[in-house]
Swiss-Prot record:
InterPro entries: PsdUridine_synth_cat_dom_sf, PsdUridine_synth_N, PUA_sf, tRNA_psdUridine_synth_fam2_C, tRNA_psdUridine_synth_TruB, TruB_C. The active site is at 43 (nucleophile). The lineage of its organism: Bacteria, Bacillati, Actinomycetota, Actinomycetes, Bifidobacteriales. Belongs to the pseudouridine synthase TruB family. Type 1 subfamily. Responsible for synthesis of pseudouridine from uracil-55 in the psi GC loop of transfer RNAs. Keywords: Isomerase, tRNA processing. This is tRNA pseudouridine synthase B. It comes from the Bacteria. It comes from Bifidobacterium longum subsp. infantis (strain ATCC 15697 / DSM 20088 / JCM 1222 / NCTC 11817 / S12).
């Protein structure tokens, strides 16, 4: 059956264990649409908000990528890893352990150097609050993680790092509007696996550690792994990320977003449009004739739906082109006549100060993205066909 190509956004709650591209592939396959993309990569270990555009809405992605974001994460203090997250190898640092004992003596009564000590969470709460307020809020400079997708002379930083080559990344300005400590758990780890859970008992050789649950709202381009690393370095005890969930991208939020940064009047209906997904496995034979098993992303739809029925269900849960445009950037209501002018590449008599979606509200027609031409006129920079 032939389909007209629809346009819109799907808000996917990405599961752990798959890449953002895996989620895009799942949407592409389910909707039978080639033109699909996402607004901001989530690492395989991360979960949460992945804004996926299809059809003409892919031309809104550049605007959405630039939006600020909210994350909920767990930072483990007391150790370091090679990747600054739980997917790397644990680095046991004698200097960091010595610093932990110094903090233990300072924050507890009778803390003795050389003994593994789990610090009271109340003492940590005050120390963390002061450290974060002083060093990790507002406008800061952040050095991205070595294992990141940033390109250096055409090569990804993580590829260079895996090859054992030295990677030097320059600090970047980012803005942290919120960095809140939500919960603290104190305990011990063996230090053999980065993802191992905390335990209460201190066996021989146990390493004291602290798991800190945080919520971070930040500008685009902020690395939460780098925040975990830098917080641990500032305290002198080491730190890395063990959990990461993105709850909000601009005005696109998951039902569990608790940032409170989206005003009720600006709230999009993304909470009822979110599509969950889960991780499964697929097995295939590669070009070398080898049998390969890897993870894949599977969109959660009602049981029994397949083909066109499953496609239509997903489209019903997608944001329309108009909703997508209004969520992606400022919007301006225009007349049908102005829409026609814009589609011919002509200017309209409107005063704007930033890139804006020009929409005919009566017909929900997104005509163009416009920008300031002069003090009294706006010009089209991206034109959309009449749906």
């Amino acid at each position: 059956m032939l389909h007209t190509t629809p346009s819109g956004l799907l808000i996917i709650d990405k599961p752990q264990g798959v890449t953002s591209f895996d989620a895009v592939a799942a949407v592409r396959g389910a909707l039978h649409i080639k033109k699909v993309g996402h607004a901001g990569t989530l690492d395989p270990m991360a979960t949460g908000t992945l804004v996926i555009a299809f059809g003409h809405a892919t031309r809104l992605l550049n605007a959405i990528v630039a939006h600020d974001k909210t994350y909920e994460a767990t930072i483990r203090l007391g150790l370091r890893t090679t990747t600054d997250d739980a997917e790397g190898e644990v680095l046991v640092d004698d200097e960091a352990r010595s610093r932990w004992q110094t903090l233990s003596a300072q924050l507890t009564e009778g803390g003795q150097s050389g003994e593994p000590t789990a610090l009271p969470t109340a003492s940590w709460q005050d120390l963390l609050t002061r450290t974060i307020a002083t060093n990790f809020t507002g406008d800061i400079e952040q050095v991205p993680n070595t294992f990141s997708a940033i390109k250096i002379n055409g090569q990804r930083a993580y590829d260079l790092a895996r090859e054992g080559k030295e990677v030097e990344l320059k600090p970047r300005p980012v803005t942290i509007s919120e960095f809140t400590v939500l919960n603290i758990r104190s305990g011990f780890v063996a230090g053999e696996q980065a993802a191992e859970p905390l335990r209460e008992d201190a066996n021989t050789g146990a390493i004291p550690a602290l798991d800190v649950d945080v919520r971070v709202s930040c500008s685009s381009g902020t690395y939460i792994r780098a925040l975990a690393r830098d917080l641990g370095n500032e305290l002198g005890v080491g730190g890395y990320l063990t959990r990461l969930r993105r709850t909000r991208v601009g005005r696109f939020a998951l039902p569990d977003d608790a940032s409170g940064l989206i005003a009720p009047e600006a709230m999009l209906d993304t909470r009822t449009h979110t599509v969950t997904a889960h991780t499964d496995q697929k097995t295939f034979t590669n070009r070398e004739g080898q049998t390969v098993t890897r993870n894949k992303c599977v969109l959660d739809t009602p049981e029994g739906l397949a083909g066109d029925e499953r496609r239509n269900w997903l489209l019903d849960h997608a944001l329309t082109m108009e909703q997508a445009a209004r969520g992606a950037m400022p919007a301006l209501d225009i007349t049908p006549e102005e829409a026609s002018e814009l589609r011919f590449g002509r200017r309209i008599e409107r005063t704007i100060s930033e890139p804006t979606a020009a929409i005919v509200p009566q017909t929900h027609d997104v005509a163009a993205i416009i920008e300031r031409a002069n003090a009294h006129q706006a010009k089209p920079v991206t034109v959309f066909p009449l749906a």
